């Protein structure tokens, strides 16, 4: 028996030629226009299949299109939310923003009906003007309205990659010095060994180039240094500035056209070009998520919205519509008992990161308070009853446009509608037949998400310092911190100057052990981190363990000091003992910038700026703190001094 030919639901339009063929076909095309790196919207496929089967209309076509490679769709590049575009006779006749299944279905029916009338001569086609193709003047008017609102926005960032040969040649410090001289701030600095798979994913925009395989071999030949960069108060222009500094992609061309550029100095050709820089603000956000999924850029308060100019063209930035968001998900009791593992697997497959989670039993009062806005609805009582009949699992989910992405996966709130319109949605798949409400909650806006998350998760921030004696184990320590549920909101490698170390230990100035404490903390590089978690201050101190590593090994063998400390003096990690002290130390190290998950409002009063405390120490300052190996051994051998320092640190911490 002959094998049945598979029917393709959605055509794949991934070249300009394929696009033009489709647009010249005379059909009505419903196009899921998506970024290559995030793929098409899968939550709506079930509905499209049902519509195709029910209507059976040959005029109707479904397709997916990568906006990255189709010039006609250039204005949709960098738009992370789903865009469903309706083309009749090659003209745009309608558009639906976001995965709104009922609206997509309604628009399909309406535009199909109109196309039949147009083809029969009953009406003329009306071309739809999409807001994404507005003129620069129209965009600027909209942005001016947004700027009047003001508010706290994220600083713009770019991602830099110092490639393996430069790292192996010991030229990283030279480049870091040039970065500092250009007025660029390093927000994060991490050594990373890329796998072949990671490198192919990162450079997928180069996969059609002849040198692609050589490029992959090159960037995986040794460790890279990955940097997150910003500049000034807002970070505006840092993408363009960094690309100007590194020069043309092909280092051979750079040597001819821009001999002072970093690629001209450190690179050889298009493959071995020494450095990487994000090509746009949108790419910077994608690359930030690729290398530092937990990292949130600092924010600043501005009277203007954070609109950027990328390559001379004004465009909306991630800070106006954040691409990296968090949202609250709740698995209700019946589903938690019956489908927990399956739901968590779906969340993982969709690319969400679970930043925090908490299983809890709500009282009736708590449930009523949480859903107070629904108090006058028919489903309020069944909802409260469901939320209090057993434990719920609350999840903080992180993803690009997390709020919309999670809600698109959930489907309609009414279970019957979800089953009918989006049978592949989570509310349809994991319904409980006897329940009167759906089994999954999702915040309906970014503002609601923040409010709801604050009700569930009582987040604090604290400072963690990986000391010079444990800096070689920083990756393992950071891994342990992440496993314990901490989010790294910001990090900075520093060679502490005596000035900054003195500020951190200011309360111990004048004591007999003060100089030894300062000498130890300035004896080599440290890693400063702002950690966010529920009850972060107390939680981190529990994980660190006792000051004396021998005591830690006996009483807290799983603690960080039991695993990584060498002695009482060299005990791996430090953190403040109170929330007030933590906020003070964060200001000393990172200045007055705001960091995401800041529940203590670390915002400085307007006009007050600490100009020095957040600076990266210069090479000159670092040189003042250099110590010989013999000096370190001599200090480590002085047990009386170690004990004095230990007592000081116990009091300080």
Swiss-Prot record:
Annotated region (NDK 2), positions in chain: 324-459
Free-text comment about domains: Contains 3 inactive NDK domains that each lack the active His residue, suggesting that they have no NDP kinase activity.
Composition bias type Acidic residues, residue spans: 617-633
InterPro entries, per database record: NDK-like_dom, NDK-like_dom_sf, Nucleoside_diP_kinase, Thioredoxin-like_sf, Thioredoxin_domain, TXND_domain-containing
Gene Ontology terms describing biological process: cell differentiation; CTP biosynthetic process; GTP biosynthetic process; spermatogenesis; UTP biosynthetic process
Ranges where the record places region Disordered: 300-323, 603-653
Gene name of the encoded protein: CiIC3
Cysteine disulfide partners in this protein: 38-41
Tissue and organ distribution: Testis-specific.
Top-level taxon in the UniProt lineage: Eukaryota
Stretches assigned to coiled coil: none
PANTHER family: NME/NM23 FAMILY MEMBER 8, NME_NM23 FAMILY MEMBER 8
GO MF entries: nucleoside diphosphate kinase activity
Protein family according to the UniProt entry: In the C-terminal section; belongs to the NDK family.
Residues of the signal peptide: none
Name of the protein described by the UniProt record: Thioredoxin domain-containing protein 3 homolog
Role summary: May be required during the final stages of sperm tail maturation. May act by reducing disulfide bonds within the sperm components.
